[in-house]
Structures are given as C-alpha cells and as structure tokens.
Swiss-Prot record:
It comes from Wigglesworthia glossinidia brevipalpis. This is Phosphoglucosamine mutase. The gene is glmM. NCBIfam families: glmM, PRK10887.1. Binds 1 Mg(2+) ion per subunit. GO terms for cellular component: cytosol.
Length: 446
C-alpha cells in the first residue's frame, strides 16, 4: 500500500478536480473495479453512496457509468454514512459497496472507500490489483457507449433499524439532553432521529448541509462549538460525528473531550463488568499511554495495530477479539459491524449511561490520558524527511529527554501530503517544546 499511486490508508482521497479526483478517473476506476468483480450468472450489483459534498453526485454518476461498461449494475443510495455502506453491502449481498467521501476533510476534497461483499474494507492485495489494472488500462475511446445500469434506492430506514438493533429494546434516554453535531455530513438525517426515538431531548448542530459546509467549523475535527452548546444548554453530553459518520468524539457535561481511547475504555469496562469481554482490546500506535495503563490495571490485554481502522480490524480477527478503536474516533465493535461506526459506538455509550444511571464524566474516571500534542507538517508527496539524519538525530535526542515517560511517533499520512508528529508524556510543557523542535527539524529538510 505504501507504494501505491492512488490508495492510501483509507481508500483514495485528494483535491476535487485534480487527478485522481476527477470524473474521468472515477469512470476508469468503475470500469476496472467492474472487470475485477464481474462474474457470469452473479448478482453483479454494487452499492454506491456519498456524503453531502457537492462534488459527490457527478463522481458517483461517472463511477456508476464505468461499472456499467464492465457489466455491473449500481444501486445509488444517495447521502448516507460510510459505515451504512459497509452494513448494507453485506446485508444485500452486493458484490461491493463504495462510499464517495473524503471523511473528515473539507468539501474541497473528495475520495472513495471500497467495501467487499462481506462489508469489510478491501485488502491491501485487492487495492494493489486495482492499481495494477489502472496502470495497464489503455485510453478508453471517447465514443464508448454502454447502457447505464443503475437504480436509485432509499435504504436509510434499513440502516436506522440496524443501528437501533445494536442496543437493548428497553433502552430509554428520556431526560437526557444531548447536543448532536453531524458535521453537515451524512449522519444529519439519521442520528438526531434515532436519539429522539429513544427519548432523548436533542439539540442539533451541523444538520444543514449545503454541499459546501461539510466539516466546516464543526464535526469531530472542530468541537469548539459543540462544547460551547453543551455548556450553554446545560446538556448531559455532546456527540460529534465526522462528515461520513465513521468517527465519533464526545463531550461530557463539564465540557471535557472524550475521544476514541476513552470510548474504547468505557465499552471495555462495561463488557468486563458483564463478563462479555472476549479476550482483550486493540488500539493503534496513536493510542494514548493512559489507555494502556488503565487497561493493565484491569488486567485487560491490549495490543497496538498499525494506524487505520482496517488494521485494527485485522488485529482483532487475528486475536479473536471483539473491540478496538483509534483515538481519532474510529470504534470497531465486531458484535455489530466490521468497520468504524460513529452512530453505533455512540449508542453503546448512551446505553451504558442509561442502564447505570451515571454520567459520561463518571465513566471516564478510571482513565487518565497523558498530555499529547499533534503537529502536521505539509510536504511534497515525493518528499520523505523521515529519512533525514537531521530528523533522526532530533528524534533520538527527544526520546532520551522523555526518559521512558512518554512516546514519540512520526509518520507520513496515508491520506494527505503531511508528516504527522505526535509527542506524548507526563509533562505538558516538555512535550510541547519537543514536538515543535521536531517539527522545525522536519521543515528544515523539506
């Protein structure tokens, strides 16, 4: 995957209008995917959904046309969360499911995430096969004609029904005041409805998509307004999703952020308490040391995977475990789904709160996260400053400075032309200084 031209850690992503996020490329991609999937006497259908970006509809259409030219039909679902595509692909036994989305990025970006027949994200091997086919694809004739075989379907209610089935029939959120930020994305017509149906009093944010405002000053990457509204309305908690609904971040009644590490801890504790925890839990290289320490106190095994929710899934399947998460808010609960699902993860937390008559703040009391600073440094796609001796030296010095009481992680982003720098430790002032020293070293060799 690291040598792929198009696929990153989570599908394909980029700037709209620049290769590969163009109608022409999406047509070719659909044609290649169709050729790989087409089988005689098979269902030969692919689900396609999108988030609320204005570019999504033309990209979806050209993708569907490319699939048609290879013999596959498309079911166009419209605006729907990415995890819904995963579920519905498996539920309908489609040959594949495709979400046209750039997740938590702004509307100037778009991309795709592809799911196989079992609802899981594509393996590295299959992504590589697609890359090879794309590289060998001869220029398609401009006058190529094929019947565009697609059907528009509304499957939102089926997904709502599925989400509701993941918690007890007896769950009652009456009396809970919840602020919900849907990032002007694809959860806007689902999450508020679900929570109201369960009895909650819902205050809505980010529920007015216009094609251009997805993730803009809202959602999981910008929770300042959510925090403000939780405090203003004296709400019990706040929930933020990202643009395509596969991430969740929460806010407690005091305005504290509750991230993917804490959500994972809460769910693990509940399952342990009810003797339903099968083995241990999986985090990633980015998971906070505080999570590892808290789980160790409970004697719950903990393993770190590579960054990316599909690698969390791979490790869960390898270990035979059921729950894992990224601190960014991708939470995988294999009892229910095989990909990160913000709505389902949120429902589990609300169910735990309701049945224990407690607060989100109280559920987080057993985990103390270390201060952690994240810095992104823009680079050219071909540039790799991580190979620089200057950068290697500053990392070595910084690790000695932490003296075993923290972690340093530098990596190239799998979705954007960035170097991501993470420094974590007990002393906040120290890690801030170390992180900026490393960032300056990276910038000096770009």
């Amino acid at each position: 995957m690291e040598n792929n031209k198009y696929f990153g850690t989570d599908g394909i992503r980029g700037k709209v209008g620049k290769n590969p996020i163009t109608p022409e490329f999406f047509f070719k991609l659909g044609f290649v995917i169709g050729n790989l999937l087409y089988k005689e006497n098979s269902f030969n259908k692919v689900l396609i959904g999108n988030d609320t970006r204005q570019s999504g509809f033309i990209l979806e259409s050209t993708l569907a046309y490319g699939l048609s030219c290879s013999g596959l039909s498309s079911l166009l679902i419209g605006s729907i969360p990415t995890p819904a595509i995963s579920y519905l692909t498996s539920y309908l036994k489609a040959d594949a499911g495709i979400s046209v989305s750039a997740s938590h990025n702004l509307c100037s970006d778009n991309g795709i995430k592809i799911f196989s027949v079992n609802g899981k994200k594509l393996s590295d091997k299959l992504e590589n096969d697609i890359e090879i086919k794309l590289s060998k694809l001869t220029i398609l004739k401009k006058n190529i004609y094929c019947k565009n075989k697609y059907q528009k379907v509304n499957l939102i209610n089926q997904y709502i029904k599925f989400c509701r089935s993941t918690v007890s029939n007896n769950i009652n959120l009456k009396g809970l005041n919840i602020v919900v930020d849907c990032a002007n994305g694809s959860t806007y017509q689902i999450a508020p409805v679900l929570l109201k149906n369960l009895g909650a009093n819902v205050f809505k944010l980010g529920c007015n998509p216009n094609g251009k405002n997805i993730n803009y000053k809202c959602g999981t990457t910008n929770i300042s307004l959510l925090r403000k509204k939780v405090l203003q309305n004296k709400a019990h908690l706040g929930i933020a999703y990202d643009g395509d609904g596969d991430r969740i971040i929460m806010i407690d009644h005091l305005g504290n952020i509750v991230n993917g590490d804490q959500i994972l801890y809460i769910i693990a504790c509940d399952k342990l308490k009810n003797k339903k925890l099968n083995g241990g839990v999986v985090g990633t290289l980015m998971s906070n040391m505080g999570l590892e320490i808290a789980l160790k106190k409970l004697e719950v095994p903990f393993i770190r995977s590579r960054i990316g929710d599909r690698y969390v899934l791979n490790e869960l399947e390898k270990q035979g475990w059921k729950i894992g998460a990224e601190n960014s808010g991708h939470v995988i609960l294999l009892d229910h789904t095989s990909t990160g699902d913000g709505i389902i993860a949120g429902l589990q937390i609300l169910s735990i709160i309701a049945k224990n008559n407690t607060t989100l703040k109280n559920l987080c009391n057993g985990i103390n996260l270390f201060p952690q600073i994240l810095i992104n440094v823009q680079i050219d796609k071909e540039n790799n400053p991580l190979e620089s001796n200057i950068v290697k030296k500053i990392i070595e010095i910084s690790k000695k400075n932490l003296d075993g009481n923290g972690r340093i992680l530098l990596r190239k982003s799998g979705t954007e032309p960035l170097i991501r720098i993470m420094v974590e430790g007990k002393e906040e002032n120290k890690i801030i200084k170390l992180a900026y020293n490393i960032a300056n070293a990276v910038k000096s060799v770009i």
